[in-house]
Structure formats: structure tokens, C-alpha cells
Amino acid sequence: MKVIGSLKSAKIRDKDCRVVRRKGRIYVINKKNPRFKARQGY
């Protein structure tokens, strides 16, 4: 999982990427290709 400052570039990398909020953090998840996972950094 990558930790990046802005998720805008992460969510447009693949059409199956979804932006999810969990425990106050924002994540990008992708069930079809899990290597696109990312988390907002701050």
C-alpha cells in the first residue's frame, strides 16, 4: 500500500478504484487489482 499526499492521482489510475473512509483515514481500494491500494498521508 502506498501512502501519498493526494489521492486524486491514485483514484484515476484504474477504473475499478474506489475511495473509502475508514477510521478517519481515506483509502483507495481496488478489488480486481490490489496493487493500486493507497492511503492518504496526513
Swiss-Prot record:
Taxonomic superkingdom: Bacteria
The protein, known as: Large ribosomal subunit protein bL36
GO CC terms of this entry: ribonucleoprotein complex; ribosome
UniProt GO molecular function: structural constituent of ribosome
Name of the gene encoding the protein in the UniProt record: rpmJ
Key words of the record: Ribonucleoprotein, Ribosomal protein
Annotated transmembrane regions: none
UniProt keyword annotation of Oxidoreductase present: no
A single BP term in Gene Ontology: translation
InterPro entries: Ribosomal_bL36, Ribosomal_bL36_sp, Ribosomal_L36_bact
Family of the protein in this entry: Belongs to the bacterial ribosomal protein bL36 family.
Pfam families listed in its UniProt record: Ribosomal_L36
NCBIfam families assigned: PRK00831.1, rpmJ_bact
